[in-house]
Amino acid sequence: MTETGVIGCGCRGVTGGNFFHPGGFSLKSCFLEQSTKRNRNFFRSVSMIPPFKRGRFITKLRSVAGNSRIFSMDAREKSRSFVLVSSRHKRVPVFVMMPIDTFGIDASGCPKIKRLKALTVSLKALKLAGVHGIAVEVWWGIVERFSPLEFKWSLYEELFRLISEAGLKLHVALCFHSNMHLFGGKGGISLPLWIREIGDVNKDIYYRDKSGFSNNDYLTLGVDQLPLFGGRTAVQCYEDFMLSFSTKFEPYLGNVIEEISIGLGPSGELRYPAHPSGDGRWKFPGIGEFQCHDKYMMEDLMAVASQEGKPQWGSRDPPNTGCYNSFPSGVPFFEEGNDSFLSDYGRFFLEWYSGKLICHADAILAKAADVLRRRQEEEKSSVMLVAKIGGIYWWYKTSSHPAELTAGYYNTSLRDGYDPVASVLSRHGAALNIPCLDMADSEIPEKYLCSPEGLRRQIHDVSKKWTIHVTGRNTSERFDEMGLRQIRENCVQPNGDTLRSFTFCRMNEKIFRVENWNNFVPFIRQMSADM
């Protein structure tokens, strides 16, 4: 993709002295101040505030798609046609995610599949129960582990063959992140070793918080377009991986492999690592912290601020934003004062911060869609491209939605932060995978002003607007009858359509316990019938 402006992607950058978010939001024209000021309770429910006309400002949102040079009407039309056809049925295929410890590292440092015999038996049991397919994480840190451009697929060839022989389909998750934080740093899958060697010398290839702590689970967006990896940019590394995958598993595409989700951030989700629970820095329901203090992100911020004519805005992220475990009450930036998220600087920073995330998704999904499009042009069976977003549902009922802001979703009572995300997915013909299908507002303490239900409704609305598929997953482990019933009910969208598919997270020994299996099997069969 070509680079324009100061943000390294094919989105529109700076035009005519105004700073533009990649989605086309001008800081100087985006908001009009109303003459009437109202005193509002900071903690009132968003559902009571009319959308896009809440309080002091009126937003004028312009579509991301309208500004993109890579917009593909073919992808949009294909997506729309696909949604209309799929909505005629009411069945939801269920994929079960592989165990979190499926892969291990042997004494020689090479990856291996653990408990292969037990896995074979488990796959047969899931097939008999009516499960449609298996979701498999394909790790960058396994396949391209030792040297750049040396892809070793033998482990996945064995696993895919095993799943196919069991009569199951595949959802493949291409993972460009690490999950070592889930194992306390003493296990799991890291980023490729050659990437880590670069990171040992240059820690700024990773996200960094305001205290200087780095997060080596995923490369910072700041290096997306910088040739720091043996002459390749991060986006080129991701593209080469996807090309190698599609070449190796071409016979499976559209046949056994039905869905491919593209990793776009920590845990494969399009977001910043603003809530790092693995190392103890963050605990629910903290608001999190902005993750833009590596030198590459800060250099970009300074360049954008200078072009906006406000160089002083580029020297730091917003002050008075609290810390990881702060509550929004008493944190000035997330309230409504002069230095809040409503200020000129607050809007500037949030446009830039969220805009970098949108450009990141745009660049990678463009590469992924191009790879799959080549297969479709060769009259291969179609594969659904999928992108995951995080389920940041706490403090959702506040005006500022602080936990979403730190994660990179510029979603407030004044602005729909998921609309530009859905727009990017729409132009690339990708489906949106949403979390929290197992959750209800009534199950969460009211004092944290959570609303997984409100979040789901908002995402369903933008998905309908942009005519994209919606798939889903659970956030917490549920085997109880009520939790499974809740998932089933949430797989039916407000307009009566069903989700395209559901991924159950995840397979482990608990699922096969008699008391859980007796709930799980009826759940699978109900999902496989007309709902």
Swiss-Prot record:
Q: What keywords does the record list, in alphabetical order?
A: Carbohydrate metabolism, Chloroplast, Plastid, Polysaccharide degradation, Transit peptide
What positions does the transit peptide occupy in this chain? 1-62
The keyword Chloroplast is annotated on this UniProt entry: yes
What does the record list as GO biological process?
starch catabolic process
Q: Where in the cell is it found?
A: Plastid, Chloroplast
Q: In the UniProt record, does the keyword Plastid occur?
A: yes
Q: What happens when the gene is disrupted?
A: Slightly retarded growth rate and reduced starch breakdown in leaves during the night.
Tissue distribution: Preferentially expressed in vascular tissue of cotyledons, leaves, petioles, stems, petals, siliques and roots, particularly in phloem. Also present in root tip.
Query: What Pfam families would the database entry show?
Result: Glyco_hydro_14
Q: Which InterPro entries match?
A: Glyco_hydro_14, Glyco_hydro_14B_pln, Glycoside_hydrolase_SF
Its primary localisation, in coarse terms, equals: plastid
Homology family = Belongs to the glycosyl hydrolase 14 family.
Name the PANTHER family on file: BETA-AMYLASE 1, CHLOROPLASTIC, INACTIVE BETA-AMYLASE 4, CHLOROPLASTIC
Q: What is this protein called?
A: Inactive beta-amylase 4, chloroplastic
Specify the species: Arabidopsis thaliana (Mouse-ear cress)
